C-alpha cells in the first residue's frame, strides 16, 4: 500500500480553484482564511474559540452568509451550490481565479471607519471610530451577499448570477456594486461625525 504525503496532495476549492492568492491589504491578511480545503464545511468547530472564524476558509464564510437570513436558513447545500455556480460564472466572465476576485472584492468593500454612539450626560454623540479588521471582513461579506439578494429579489435573474455580478463589480471598485455604495455611505457618515 502506498503512503501519501500531505504536502504532495493538491487540494482545490470545489475541485477547481487554487487558494494561493494575493491579499494586498496587510490588515486583512490574518482574517481572510485561505487554507486549501476540498469541501468548505467545518461544522462550526470554530465557534467557542476567540477569533476562531478568522481561521475559517473565506469561501465557507461566504457560503454561511448566503445561508443566513430568511428562507435559506440552515440550507447549507443550497448555499454551497449557489456559491459554486457563482464562482463558475466569475471564472467565465473574468478569466481569473474566483477566489482572487472574491478577496479583491472584500478588500475594496470593507469599510475603514464607522460611527458608534457615546452617551455623555444624557446626550448621545456619534463618534467616528476605526473598524477592526475582523469586522471589516464580516461587513464586506454581509454587504456582498445583501447586494446579490437585493438584485435577484422580484427579478428573473437567479441569485447565482447576481452574486457573481456583485463580486465582480466590487472587485473592480464599481459604484454600481451595493457593497461599494454601502462602504462609501458608512465612511461618509463617519467623516461627517469626526
From Swiss-Prot:
Annotated SUPFAM superfamilies: Ribosomal protein S7 (SSF47973)
GO BP: translation
SS bond partners: none
Keywords linked to the UniProt accession: Ribonucleoprotein, Ribosomal protein, RNA-binding, rRNA-binding
A Pfam family recorded for this sequence: Ribosomal_S7
InterPro entries referenced in this protein's UniProt entry, alphabetically: Ribosomal_uS7, Ribosomal_uS7_arc, Ribosomal_uS7_CS, Ribosomal_uS7_dom, Ribosomal_uS7_dom_sf, Ribosomal_uS7_euk/arc
Family to which the UniProt record says this protein belongs: Belongs to the universal ribosomal protein uS7 family.
Subunit and partners: Part of the 30S ribosomal subunit.
Known role: One of the primary rRNA binding proteins, it binds directly to 16S rRNA where it nucleates assembly of the head domain of the 30S subunit. Is located at the subunit interface close to the decoding center.
Name recorded for this polypeptide: Small ribosomal subunit protein uS7
Natural source organism: Sulfurisphaera tokodaii (strain DSM 16993 / JCM 10545 / NBRC 100140 / 7)
Amino acid at each position: 500500500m502506498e503512503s501519501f504525503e500531505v504536502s504532495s496532495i493538491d487540494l482545490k476549492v470545489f475541485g477547481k480553484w487554487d487558494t494561493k492568492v494575493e491579499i494586498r491589504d496587510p490588515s486583512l491578511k490574518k482574517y481572510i482564511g485561505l487554507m486549501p480545503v476540498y469541501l468548505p464545511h467545518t461544522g462550526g468547530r470554530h465557534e467557542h474559540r476567540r477569533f476562531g472564524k478568522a481561521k475559517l476558509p473565506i469561501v465557507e464564510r461566504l457560503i454561511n452568509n448566503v445561508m443566513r437570513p430568511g428562507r435559506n436558513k440552515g440550507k447549507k447545500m443550497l448555499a454551497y451550490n449557489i456559491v459554486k455556480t457563482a464562482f463558475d460564472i466569475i471564472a467565465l466572465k473574468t478569466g481569473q481565479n474566483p477566489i482572487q476576485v472574491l478577496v479583491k472584492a472584500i478588500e475594496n468593500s470593507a469599510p475603514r471607519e464607522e460611527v458608534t454612539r457615546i452617551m455623555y450626560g444624557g446626550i448621545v454623540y456619534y463618534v467616528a471610530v476605526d473598524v477592526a479588521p475582523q469586522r471589516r471582513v464580516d461587513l464586506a461579506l454581509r454587504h456582498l451577499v445583501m447586494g446579490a439578494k437585493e438584485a435577484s429579489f422580484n427579478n428573473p435573474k437567479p441569485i447565482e448570477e447576481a452574486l457573481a455580478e456583485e463580486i465582480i463589480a466590487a472587485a473592480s471598485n464599481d459604484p454600481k456594486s451595493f457593497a461599494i455604495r454601502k462602504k462609501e455611505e458608512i465612511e461618509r457618515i463617519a467623516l461627517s461625525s469626526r
